[in-house]
Amino acid sequence: MLFRSGCSPVAQAFVEGSDTIRPVKPSTIAKSLAIGNPADGYFALDVVRSTGGGLAAVTDDEVVEGMRLLARTEGIFAETAGGVTIATLKRLAAEGVVRPDERVVVYITGHGLKTLEAVAPHCGPTATIAPSLDAFRAAFDIEEAS
């Protein structure tokens, strides 16, 4: 499971071995995950514990790095929640919670343009182009195949 360290009451309870989800004031670039008092937190804890899963809280810097990693390796520009997912998987793999021989499915459903303002300082400028293949080719300096 994934949680952002600026908003990770479920991960905190997991680390403490507690069933009590203590509300927090969210502070994260991952706005879609900024839920300081998750209604289903206890159920999330139960699922992780009953399946032998793991939880991790990641920093905003790790979120941005997760987004960059996904863009660089898969060509996918995910929103910040997707960056949280990748950063968490990376952390759990480094900690040995996820083993190299395991198959893992990571759901990335939100496009990076949804949260561009949160990562703009880390990603550089964006280009606005006309909605045409020629404009796309020109923006990326791609020559038409003959």
Where are these regions (language model features)?
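Short, low-complexity, polar/charged sequence segments that are solvent-exposed and flexible
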Residues: 19-22, 52, 74-77, 123-127
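Glycine-rich phosphate/pyrophosphate-binding loop at beta-loop-alpha junctions
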Residues: 1-50, 111-119
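Short glycine- and Lys/Arg-enriched binding-loop motifs that mark or flank ligand-binding interfaces
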Residues: 28, 32, 71, 78, ...
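Exposed alpha-helical structural elements
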Residues: 9, 28, 43, 62, ...
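Generic beta-strand/beta-sheet core signal
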Residues: 3, 36, 58, 79-81, ...
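Active-site-adjacent helical/loop segments in soluble small-molecule enzymes
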Residues: 39-99
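Phosphate-binding loop/pocket of nucleotide- and phosphate-handling active sites
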Residues: 22-24, 86-146
